[in-house]
Amino acid sequence: MQIRLFHLQNSRSQRIIWFLEELGLNYELITKYHSDEDKNNNSPHQLSKFPTLEIIEQEQTSILAETSAILDYFSHLHPQLGQNNLLNQQLQNFYYWKNYCEATFIPDLVLKQIFHQIAERTPFLVRFVPKLLKYGFDQGYLNQSLQRHMSMIDKHLERHLWFAGDQFTTADILMWFPLLACSQNYSQFKHIQRYLVQIENRPAFKNALIKGQWSASTFQTYWAIAW
């Protein structure tokens, strides 16, 4: 099997590089930059999704996008980071956090960026209108919602080494990105901070940051201005 990963720098596709590094798989990495106009680096997916994988097997090429779908498919082929060897409560934790990340946590986080981008792209003379809407939505709903997310996660990590329990799984790979995006605004949650340091010490994670050309400062600035 040949694997070609189309990756957008400093995006959620960083998690797939990390995943492939954890599995020790060989892959070709094609990186797209936000300022890059080279169409050769575009995702082959019809919706130009990142991450996207081209999987070449027995002279046939298939396209697979969506982070969770990629993790699930390769966890089926390489089950060591999936539900293998998890006991009942650990299995429940695994499925809950894996699905909670993409279905509940990230949508609230993305709303921060959507409202910020709307305000930034509105003509200057009327920009105060979307900024007021953003402020009202933040104060009335979004900030409280994210606070509840982080509080719940911190309490879980107080009792567990990883999201499933004692075993590192793909749930941890998924949860890393939104936690990092929120962490600079919620530094009071010490168990989340411990967890992020724990991730940063993994050799596969360090390799993935280098290969994905991850910029911590760019990432922090991107999310800080959305608050």
Positions of PLM-derived features:
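Terminal-tail/helix-coil boundary detector
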Residues: 208-227
